[in-house]
């Protein structure tokens, strides 16, 4: 086992898993509480394309550089993580963005009860797209966690006794 390759792989895995987990469950909730709605939305709109690209591509990079045999466990966990990132990037992100734009447009056109009625439908749709996005983000994190467990086990088996 090449020490440089293994070290680089572990550092990359740590960066991806730690970054995804930290942003999802620490930084983003804090930003939501601290920033104004428009500021938070602008921040997320800038971050999420890169965030989901990282979620989609990094499991592929990990698979190509794995210092352990990619048996069913580690390979399937990386596939789950990558497919989750791809789903967020190519389906849920555009859907959520479209709904947010529709909400902005009706807010410019309507007021009062008419706005409330039209916005209620879009809020429900946003809730669906956002909820699914959270679910796929969680499945990415779980896939990466499962890969980390497999990686640890595989590396521990290679340590001379």
From Swiss-Prot:
The keyword Repressor does not apply. The keyword Transport does not apply. InterPro entries: TMEM205-like (IPR025423), Xanthocillin_Biosynth-Assoc (IPR053009). It comes from the Eukaryota. It is found in: Mitochondrion outer membrane. GO terms for cellular component: mitochondrial outer membrane; mitochondrion. The chain crosses the membrane at residues 10-30, 60-80, 131-151. It is a multi-pass membrane protein. Keywords: Membrane, Mitochondrion, Mitochondrion outer membrane, Transmembrane, Transmembrane helix. Pfam families: DUF4149. This is Uncharacterized mitochondrial outer membrane protein YPR098C.
